[in-house]
Amino acid sequence: MTRGPVTDLGFTRAKIKIASIDIDQDLRRIDAAASQLQDSGHLAVDAMTAYDAQTGPAAASRLANCGLWWFEDVCDPLDFETQAKIATAYGGSIAAGEALFSLAEAKLLNLYGGMRKDKDILVFDPVHCYGLPGYLRIVEHLTSEGWPRQAFWPPGGHLFSLHVVAALGLGGAEVTPLAFRPFRGLPDHKGVTAGYADLPQAPGISFEMHTEARQLFRTAFSLH
């Protein structure tokens, strides 16, 4: 089967949004997306916190046999009871943390969210977490609690995660090649090869070498 545009760009893994339609339709979408990758283990799904105490465990049960890379944002980020129930019903990897901003919230997720250090994924956002210092506090605390650095996968959409991951030795960074313009993709002349990207040998966090982002800043601040 012909590969899709994401794999044509060098990506070997992908993520799709689910939970806005019937679960049977989502399962068909998952099959279609996985067919463009090596297998379903290279595909993650993001429920965008759509499920609740009733719908979440049922959806998790249906998704359990898909063999997905991970199942993300399964319910309201502060509904730790439902999060824990879904983790029990779902044998694969759960991803959580993107909509949690503080160290206190990260501690609650770790204590009450049913997250499993040997398989689950932490997707705290270094931009949302009261900035990089807040993110560093979360990483420091959770690694001291036994979480491996490989469990941390910060989101994309702001050109910041790749540098954070490289500096801290984390699991990986989400890159959005098409969405979130102008903060999409990678710095100019940098691409993805077999699922990996390297950093430019230049100071900064990649805004400086990203034409779309740089032009936006110049326009916004009347820079010439």
Q: Which stretches of residues belong to each language-model region?
A:
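Extended hydrophobic packing segments that form well-structured cores
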Residues: G204-H224
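Structural signal for hydrophobic packing residues in well-ordered secondary-structure cores
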Residues: A34-L37, G169-G172, F221
